Amino acid sequence: MSSNNDLWLHLVSQLNTQQRAAALFDYTRGLQVIAGPGTGKTKVLTSRVAYLILHHHIHPRDIIVTTFTNKAANEMKERLQEMLRGAGVNISELLIGTFHSICLKILYRFGHLVDLQKDWRIIDEKEIDVILDDMIEKVPDQIRDYASSITRKVNLCMPSKNGDEWTIHPKLIKKQISKLKSNAILPEEYILDSNHDAALGYFYQIYQSELSKKNTLDFDDLLMYTFRLLTRVRVLSNIKHVLVDEFQDTNGIQLDLMFLFAKGNHHLSRGMTIVGDPDQSIYAFRNALAHNFLEMGRKCPIEYSTIILVENYRSSQKILNTSEILITQQNKGRQNRAPLRAQFDLDFPPVYMNFPAYFLEAPSLVRELLYLKALPNLFTFNDFAILVRQRRQIKRIESALIEHRIPYKIIRGHSFWDSKETRAMLNLLKLIFSPNDKHAILASLLYPARGLGPATGEKIKNALDTLATDVSCFQILKDISSKKIMLDIPTKGRSVIADFISMIENCQLLLQSTLLGGLSDLFDKLYELSGLKYEYLYKDGKKKNDQLEKSEPNLLNARHKNIELLKNYFLALLSKSESSDKEKNEAIKAATDEAEPIENKVITPKEYLRNFFNSLSLHSDAAEEEESESNKDAKIKREKNGFVTISTIHGAKGLEWPVVFIPGCEEGIIPCVFNDDKKDESEEDEEEDQENSKKDASPKKTRVLSVEDSIDEERRMFFVAQTRAKYLLYLSNTVTVEDVDRPRIASRFLTTDLIKAMSDSQKLFESTNSIKKLYRILNKKPPAEDDKLFSLDQLRKDYNQFIENRRERMIWQGIQMNDVYGIQLSRNKLLGSVSDFTSAADQLRLETQNSIFPQKKLIEKSRPSKINGNYAPKSRVKSPEKRYAPETTSFHSPTKKKVYAPQYVSTTNVPSRQEFHSSTGKNIPFLRREDRSITDISPRSSTRSLKGASPNKTSHMSDDLMRPSPTRKDKVTRNIHFATAGTFRIETQSNVDELHPPEYSNKSGQSLTSSEFSGFSSACSNSDQPTNLIEDINNELDLSDEELLNDISIERRRELLGSKKTKKIKPKTRNRKSKRGDKVKVEEVIDLKSEFEEDDSRNTTAAELLHNPDDTTVDNRPIISNAKFLADAAMKKTQKFSKKVKNEPASSQMDIFSQLSRAKKKSKLNNGEIIVID
């Protein structure tokens, strides 16, 4: 006995003041415990049960505990078992469960007292549907006419699917019968009511008669018959106390049942304890009554008291502050309580994000999530939840997660991977990879319909089950088609099987190639030849008698769009076709979580398919795996990394996550006043237990919700969603007023006070100290400052740049990432080496960040000054070191009058490294300068003056750093350096006036006159192809191949050059090449507009067209331009007969979001897509 007292004292010591008062309250009286979110209501309930058992010695079988779900009941049993361990208490005798499960146990024992026959059972939902359909089919005409008349009392009709005619619908009949049973009204009693509906009375009577014939009860009968039993007979005379969890979610008959449970053998109810929160009542569509707290006080036959719990153990104080501002907006029908108090606080408030276009919201949320996930050893994907008000919001979020390769799960919902079309396409791909999958064979044969019926499918299944022990399933199918295996299959069926086999074998041929490019064709062929494409574009939802041939393909079909999304996922890694093998392998490794490196390995199409199916394991239900050892290890690894949770707010009730995102905080979604919540939520958001699917209140207790009541319900739902968050909370919406047809307006709940309590970005990344504080609160260890792979400071900088760029692209290692597949979140420190395949912008940022010159800064953001719709920084700073870019002066951004596209010949206008070929066929590498101050590869580089096309123009060459010319901005000069024999480099520099003519030195340091290299200058300035350039040099110097490729002496060069006559070279003009006999001057100036005008400008990129290549400052802002400007920039001005492009007025918007909004408004009737070059 003393040991039990010690145990009880130990339990009490773990409670706070309010919790202790609730647990120790007089058990003979009534008690209301108002428990806000995170205040420990389950702890109070279990402690009170333990108090009744240990202190008052009440036997467990004399206590009833009701919960909202069976899952909650099982969790409570486990807690009590742990709390009372060693006390000698048998918790299994405790009567605990949902109202339906408790009523079921009572009726099993005492059902005969209300005329229930022996061996009755619960009827299946499918049986109910059959009964209802049969009733509707046989309904008399007068009842059918009455149901559709204006004199009806209850609506039982809905529009038919294939027309505008209104017909009696079984769903509405079932709903109305459920309401009658919830009020414990039998059919004969309802018919005697003077206000009854004739049609509903008819259906109710027939329905109940059919149940009696089958000796069955439905779930509503459980409550109704128990209520009738307890009002007649006191069968629960032993009950001494009743506890009800989630009291705010109870309806009228459940409140009455609570009083009947507690009555026991007494004329009045005995002890009752109810726990709940009126602010969390969100099941009005099931007619749960938030005012049941007040109703209990009105009906309670005994004295009762109220205790309010205010100590919150879940959320930070800033999250509680925002939720308190929200819930106190309700002025009527709510009892004020003390605000909740958190046990900790953080320096960063909840984040409110507003987007100008709906399609930007989901991807931006996912990128925010990735930055948080990147914090080492802090979060797993299990720590993130995205809560939606409506299920139609899930599609975009799911697509964004798939595109970013983030594993996810949907609580009690159907994910993209569960859809029929996705499963069908995956089955076909499985057969291409391994044709021995029996399930995939059967499913692909039967869907889409090809003339192979279920009976034939069953015969094929039996043959596969019987014969597949020694022979592959696909071979058995081939034997069936060729009649080697005799089955009673129609001729048409064999033809279908033969076509199916042919399709699989033909598509398998594409896997024999070593090239990955055929995978797109493979996907398209499977989609078309299988009949899925025709099914979704033409037949889906149409009858056979429709004229399918004349109809247009429905490209907006939801199933077809899902196939396109699957294809994008399937071909995601192929999008990096220009990447190195190393980059591809890293991307595959990141996508499939492969632990072993796969570098220097050529990936075949078959291996790509294997990696694709492995990557499906990112999604909790995307792939069905066998329980092999390797799969078990992979499963453990995936569970450790976790899954992002997607759930409706209803489904999230009672759960919590460290980080919560709530998208769609706008009118029409939150609040959603006129939505059919019953249709949207009830069937999928309830617990798997069927007994919870029928909780409708009685008509007497139910009133039609007014708009004000609906708004209060929506506010409570928003409150529940916010209080699921423990540390970080994000709210977001889309606000667009330009769309007149459907403007998007911020939620009315987002008042000025609420927005002031939030921030527009995550303040966690303002400083590394804030990040470390979060680590301390979560009892996690932050990465060391000298960590070789990860830097918190770099992550903070990337995130801030991400916010500055309006969350349009992920920024990683200071680089804007258009493709996030290859990002390794565990590594963000810049390494010394870079990939051979890189963009100019990436190379510039890398070299700038690694630069040893602190005075050279990278322009990350500046207020844009608009020039003809293009943007450039107002101020110019010294440019960073640049590896792959033209080296000329830095001027303004381009306008329509001046096109600064780099009009270099193909020898220099190539962004990646190229190789020139000598006459012997050997590779001669073309070298670019690593930076402006880099030295030549040779021990001594030679600097030479160029002679060229313009005899009246003069320029000088220098190895000094580029300096802007004060007068001649469009003039550039080129230096040609020899590194070794046969290896050379061309450099472009500003026109810089020198006091002395340049000198050239050989390896020995001897000076050369510029005239000695006149022939070489001619070759460089007049050649169009690299091979011609080498041949000209070779011919001009009169060197053999061997001499050219060997390290010849400078004396030999002088001798050869001295014997040559100086030749005059005429300026290069259109359609006429220079002749070798022309005279060459010592000095030359190359005019961008004269010499380079005839180059193939269509080989330039969009960035080169819209940004001045001479401007070496790095501008990270997106390119916005109209088609006219792009076309004019790419077109040669000298082409007189070119087709003109229709002019389009220059845009007047200042940023990308305004551009998108205006484009959307202008193309409101256009179903096409807006293309943005970024």
UniProtKB/Swiss-Prot annotation:
Compositional bias of kind Low complexity: 1007-1023
Domain of life per record: Eukaryota
This enzyme's EC code(s): 5.6.2.4
Stretches assigned to the UvrD-like helicase C-terminal domain: 317-654
Phosphoserine: modified positions: 833
Cellular location(s): Nucleus
GO BP: any one term: DNA protection
UniProt similarity note: Belongs to the helicase family. UvrD subfamily.
Additional detail: Present with 5190 molecules/cell in log phase SD medium.
Protein known as: ATP-dependent DNA helicase SRS2
